[in-house]
Amino acid sequence: GLGDVYKRQPAPLAYAKLNGKELNILELWHGPTCAFKDMALQILPHFLTKSLKKTYDGKDAVILVATSGDTGKAALEGFKDVDHTKIIVFYPVDGVSPMQKHQMNTQEGNNVTVCAIKGNFDDAQTGVKKIFTTPEISAKLEANNMLFSSANSINWGRLLPQIVYYISAYCDLVNAGKIAMGDKINVVVPTGNFGNILASYYASIMGLPINKFICASNSNNVLSDFIKTGVYDLSLIHISEPTRRRGI
């Protein structure tokens, strides 16, 4: 069960020194697919099914996911064989690593489907958005007692568990004597689409003492450039790091 998944994982906060400075690192790769997104995608399906029972009279959810690699596998693993859900993952045929492609195409589960598309991640995401907003498709689902949902970070259920681990990490620092309650910390997040660092911002609004949010980026630096300049530059850069590979 879900509880067993988390019980057998080590505490995510680790301590390290870099250039003589102490860092406190959240190890978020202890989930079943070794992606940090497991932290949210292992519990999101259960949030969703509870919500369906309360608000949609038992409808089934069809989950659409666009992925550049790691989200797809983590979402498939999270939703596999979860009652009242079906999941379809779309990925760019030449835009994921051979390992990720193998992981997705060999995914077990009676409710999972994987589709390769021509184009890049943005093409996959645009296609998913088009499906979401096509009335005829939504009407067909409604007629079959189904509705669409997403496992991408546009879904609040993805952000909620991430807020929790920032607060948990702060409490761990206090308990370990690294900081005193109320001390402010800096949060550094390697980010591709701002979802993870946005969760830390929401945690700060809820009262977590954060001094700075540092958005770390590679050559796909649209977010750091946007924060510095206010200009959102649309360009496509292919990189090898899946969690920060975006057609931007």
Where are the regions that the model predicts?
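Short, small-residue-biased leader/transition segments that mark boundaries at the very start
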Residues: 2-6, 241-243, 248
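Short glycine/serine/threonine-rich phosphate/pyrophosphate-binding segments
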Residues: 64-77, 97-99, 193-200
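Domain-scale recognition of functional cores that engage charged ligands
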Residues: 126-130, 135-204, 208
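A conserved active-site cap/scaffold subdomain adjacent to cofactor or substrate pockets
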Residues: 185, 189-236, 240, 244-246
